[in-house]
Amino acid sequence: MARKAHSERTKSSLLLLLSIVMLGVGLNFLGRLLNLLLGLPLYLDNVGTLLVSMAGGLVPCITVGFFSNLINGVNDPNSTYYAVISILIAAAAVICKKKRVLQRFPAMLLAVLIFALLGGLLGGVLTWLINGKSFGEGYTVDLAVKIADALSLDYISSNLLACFLVDVADKLAVTVPSVLLFLLLPKKLLDLFRAQSWYLQKKYEGR
């Protein structure tokens, strides 16, 4: 009887984990789709990752970041290479949540800068390597040309700075709505997540 009850709890916990991961991946996909429809020079594909990092902790948010890039890789194979960046952003988001950086303004801006350093600078270096020591083309590269002219920077420095600036705008655009969504979640739902074995931080953290 006890074994059956344990099995049911495990099954329920895994279903809950699957649900929160699917929600996060879905939000990331919707953000990416919205960005494409609006024609913005951003990404908007981290709302789900950040929301899940605050609500569900490290395991589900890393899973969300990884599978979001894996799914995007179906249409854009290069997206899979950025999975490591998404995982780093997810881990950083969990730390920022634990330190209550995400939930307070203007402290939230520090989190945005951290995410942009990971997504913009590290992501920029990864782009440079993937494209054979080239940053490719597009809005960010055009911005880099203007930065190079204005500040007399070399090709790599101007492009990395452009990547960082664009990513600051992107991470601000996804951090604000993800925090607002988190604040709207019922306390009972958050308590349910925090009672699961995959929620590694057991100490109650409040919002």
Regions found by a protein language model. Name each.
Residues A2-A55, V59-L70, N75:
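Hydrophobic transmembrane alpha-helices
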Residues G56-P60, V74-Y81, C96-V101, G120-G124:
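Juxtamembrane membrane-interface segments at transmembrane alpha-helix termini
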Residues E8-T10, C96-A107:
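Membrane-interface helix-boundary motifs at transmembrane edges
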Residues I20-L27, S53, C61-V64, S68, ...:
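Alpha-helical transmembrane segments in multi-pass membrane proteins
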Residues L50, C61-G65, S79-A83, M108, ...:
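Alpha-helical transmembrane segments and their helix-entry boundary regions
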Residues G65-N72, V94-K99, Y199-R207:
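Extended, non-catalytic scaffold segments that flank or surround catalytic motifs
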Residues R32-L40, T80-Y81, Q103-R207:
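Membrane-embedded alpha-helical hairpins and interfacial helices in multi-pass inner-membrane proteins
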